[in-house]
Amino acid sequence: MRRQTVDPRIRAKVIATYGNRCWLGMPGCSITATEDDHIVPYSHGGRDTVANLRRACKHCNAMRQDRVLSGYGATLHAVIGPPRADFGMAMQSMLRRDSIVVSFDSLLRDLCPTQSKATDGLRLAAAMAWDGAARTLAKSSEPLDVWLVRTLPRSRRHPDMLAEWLALDYDVHVIETPADSTFALDLTPQEYRTAQQWYALHLT
């Protein structure tokens, strides 16, 4: 990640054109901008031009890291829904032949075909694999079509993942399954707790 400063004359033009409020608006944003942020990251060939620069607060700039805005490199989609939601059916008509799907359930199934018997350790391993894949793909400068699939849009490192996705212009899809339909299923204790957390979010 580059640390050299932008030419003050270019920065002045950026502020005159776009203002000096943080343009990212990540969770915890301090609003007042103190740093320069590249729309196309410098590491991906982004230039110090007025068109490619915006002002950001230190917090949001650090939180973004080198993640691309959706469409400036990888195009990123997120699909979220309650336990046992039919994610595959929801995405079926939208996936391309070369789409990349990062699914917690699929990763867990690869580790433990009988998911109901998955230990906490295996669930943690699947979560770490999901995080690693999502983090790497979110920084890709290649024109990939990436679909991130999970139930709860949060993790220990990213407690408000949904707000981050929206700030980075991800295409977010919410699968709306009535609560009574979900709780009528033969859920595992883990799925039941997750379902309670999901419906407490009141996402639509």
What would you call each of these model-derived segments?
Residues M1-L24, V40-R47, V68-G73:
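Short, charged surface segments at domain edges that flank catalytic/cofactor-binding sites
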Residues Y72-H77, E142-L144:
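Pre-Walker A (Motif I) flank of P-loop NTPase domains
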Residues T75-R96:
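Glycine-rich phosphate-binding P-loop
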